[in-house]
């Protein structure tokens, strides 16, 4: 497919000046965005737009969403993780929320970076502390310019080219550490640490491998028996120990595969990074799982320890000269779900057990089980006790099942309410995962996803998005449903921006076939903005998520057409040179804390964001 010009739904000029406050940040109430945008969930649907490659700029319109800022997320900083949205779930708590500013429909534009090297548009994006985008590339990992017309590689690591290996980097659970090193599990059961920048933050053309540990071999030595599961996920705890879990995206208990949970001691990692010899037999500790039990998701970590959800249980683990299981809480599952007679889908779910990675708050662990109906559970962080539980998405139309596979959004307001947004994923999973010879740890589209969904779009997945609040009371906790959207089918791993107060997604209008960016009101669940992309099937983003840029003005969405989309606001213009457009990739919006404002010499109270161009 050929490259094309940016897609516009509005003109290029704003009623705000460069280096001033954006009008969205200053105004208390503004009209919803117009043109191809839908003002609310109950309003008349937007007119069908032409396919993206045929779209041309339309006449200017005014309007933007009012800011509904929330308190920043309650995530204590991990001293061993990068101070950025450093993993696929944005932080070590797996909140799938960001404190970054995201677009508000201020003369919105969609820009495209076209992929000419990789087999797909970047399916995962993490940012280091310098603002570099770290993405998968040809089975390896790279730092790339995602805003260039053609996605440009600045530096990379190729297992085949640089390490003589046939393995792949497993990108889903790769992350950035506090020194901006890339920490990544591999398909051959190793964990690597890669140095990608120099001391000044300049990108190295070829990344340096500074650590390489065969986790499977070390774990087998510690366990004293063979492991028949593969390495799935890794994360640092708050003491710098590297936790790992074996498993896959679907683990059948009856197959009796042997798996483990465990960690590599921080002291051993530091010794290796310092060029010293270390005895891994004294530094790798494991917790043997019952045969048939394994992880199916990522690991969360807080000062309390590492939280791991297997297909059977939820664990809180600590490093204490060995793996200390602080608590283990079992949960319900009816097993892997697949489409049956009378269903409107052909695929199924993904996991055998709970499908979403566990998410933490300072006091709770949140996850969904895989019962029928599916339940949202809240566990006490200290004891593992189930303190609240409620069915979710239990009133869908006939012909649809429920599988919560995408990580839930969890937002703790710091005042006793934890809001969880769950999204149905059923139908997107490959029914072939039930094949006894299938390796569900292989992270490829062909292995994981239903072919009919890839070709026919979101008509082939079940709908359902719901917000449930867990509220602290005098007697404990109670859960209540706040809103439900049974008309939305989303597989894009929705994101919450605390800076704007909105939920961001990517859906397909099943009437027009149009793939769209969508913004929901966090409080009401109403659709307050849509922006059309294309009605061609290849604009399915294939459940690989959306990613928030660190400029305060970019929401990235990969597609199947080798195009990485980014939604941006034209929030700034040059009043004395109106014929010249400001490069939106050189404009930024950041939440300015009162403390930082005072340190920078500001007087008075911060009224808005800091906008620069």
PLM regions: where:
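C-terminal motif of bacterial Sec signal peptides marking the signal peptidase cleavage site
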Residues: 22-25
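Blade-loop segments of beta-propeller domains
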Residues: 117-124, 132, 138, 143-189, ...
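Surface-exposed loop and turn segments in beta-propeller and other repeat-based domains
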Residues: 157-165, 208-226, 276-292, 327-350, ...
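Structural motif
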Residues: 138-145, 188-196, 250-264, 312-318, ...
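Repeated scaffold domains used in trafficking and secretory/extracellular systems
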Residues: 117-126, 161-175, 219-235, 291-301, ...
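Loop/turn-rich, solvent-exposed surfaces of beta-rich toroidal or solenoidal domains
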Residues: 409-536
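Beta-strand-rich domains and repeat architectures in extracellular enzymes and scaffolds
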Residues: 66-142, 170-172
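Blade-level signature of beta-propeller repeat domains, shared across WD40, Kelch, NHL, RCC1
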Residues: 541-613
């Amino acid at each position: 497919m050929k490259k094309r010009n940016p897609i516009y739904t509005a003109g290029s000029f704003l009623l705000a000046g460069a280096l001033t406050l954006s009008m969205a940040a200053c105004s208390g109430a503004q009209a919803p965005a117009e043109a191809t945008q839908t003002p609310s969930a109950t309003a008349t649907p937007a007119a069908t737009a032409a396919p993206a490659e045929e779209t041309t700029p339309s006449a200017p319109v005014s309007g933007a969403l009012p800011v509904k800022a929330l308190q920043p997320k309650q995530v204590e900083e991990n001293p061993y993780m990068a101070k950025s949205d450093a993993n696929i779930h944005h932080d070590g708590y797996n909140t799938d929320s960001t404190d970054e500013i995201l677009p508000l429909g201020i003369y919105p534009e969609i820009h495209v970076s076209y992929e000419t090297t990789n087999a797909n548009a970047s399916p995962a994006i993490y940012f280091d502390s310098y603002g570099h985008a770290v993405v998968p590339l040809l089975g390896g990992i790279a730092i790339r310019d995602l805003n260039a017309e053609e996605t440009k590689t600045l530096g990379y690591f190729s297992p085949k080219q640089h390490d003589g290996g046939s393995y792949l980097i497993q990108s889903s659970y790769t992350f950035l550490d506090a020194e901006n090193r890339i920490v990544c599990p591999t398909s051959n059961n190793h964990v690597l640490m890669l140095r990608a920048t120099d001391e000044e933050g300049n990108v190295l053309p070829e990344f340096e491998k500074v650590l390489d540990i065969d986790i499977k071999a070390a774990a087998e030595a510690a366990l004293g028996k063979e492991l028949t599961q593969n390495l799935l996920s890794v994360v640092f705890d708050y003491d710098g120990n590297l936790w790992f879990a074996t498993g896959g995206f679907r683990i059948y208990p009856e197959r009796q595969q042997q798996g483990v949970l465990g960690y590599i001691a921080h002291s051993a990692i530091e010794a290796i990074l310092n060029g010293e010899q270390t005895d891994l037999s004294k530094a790798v500790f494991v917790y043997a799982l019952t045969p048939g039990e394994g992880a199916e998701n990522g690991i969360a970590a807080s000062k309390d320890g590492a939280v791991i959800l297997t297909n059977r249980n939820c664990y809180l683990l600590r490093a204490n000269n060995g793996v200390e299981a602080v608590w283990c809480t079992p949960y319900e599952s009816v097993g892997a779900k697949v489409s049956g007679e009378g269903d409107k889908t052909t695929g199924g779910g993904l996991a055998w057990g709970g499908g979403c990675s566990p998410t933490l708050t300072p006091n709770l662990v949140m996850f969904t089980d895989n019962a029928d109906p599916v339940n949202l559970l809240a566990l006490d962080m200290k004891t593992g006790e189930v303190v609240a539980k409620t069915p979710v998405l239990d009133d869908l139309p006939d012909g649809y099942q429920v599988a919560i596979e995408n990580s839930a959004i969890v937002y703790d307001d710091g005042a006793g309410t934890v809001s969880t947004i769950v999204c149905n994923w059923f139908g997107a999973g490959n029914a072939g995962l039930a094949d006894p010879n299938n390796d569900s740890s292989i992270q490829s589209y062909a292995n994981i996803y239903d072919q009919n969904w890839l070709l026919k779009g979101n008509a082939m997945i079940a709908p359902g998005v719901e917000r449930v609040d867990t509220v602290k009371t005098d007697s404990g906790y109670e859960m209540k449903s706040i809103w439900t959207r049974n008309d939305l089918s989303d597989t894009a791993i929705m994101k919450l921006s605390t800076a704007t107060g909105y939920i961001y997604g990517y859906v397909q209008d099943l009437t027009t076939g149009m793939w769209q960016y969508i913004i929901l009101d966090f409080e009401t669940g109403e659709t307050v903005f849509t922006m059309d992309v294309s009605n061609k099937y290849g604009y399915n983003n294939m459940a690989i998520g959306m990613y928030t840029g660190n400029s305060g003005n970019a929401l990235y969405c990969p597609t199947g057409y080798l195009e990485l989309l980014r939604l941006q606001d034209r929030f700034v213009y040059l009043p004395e040179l109106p014929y010249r457009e400001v490069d939106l990739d050189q404009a930024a919006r950041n939440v300015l804390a009162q403390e930082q404002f005072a340190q920078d010499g500001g007087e008075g109270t911060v009224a808005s964001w800091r906008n620069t161009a």
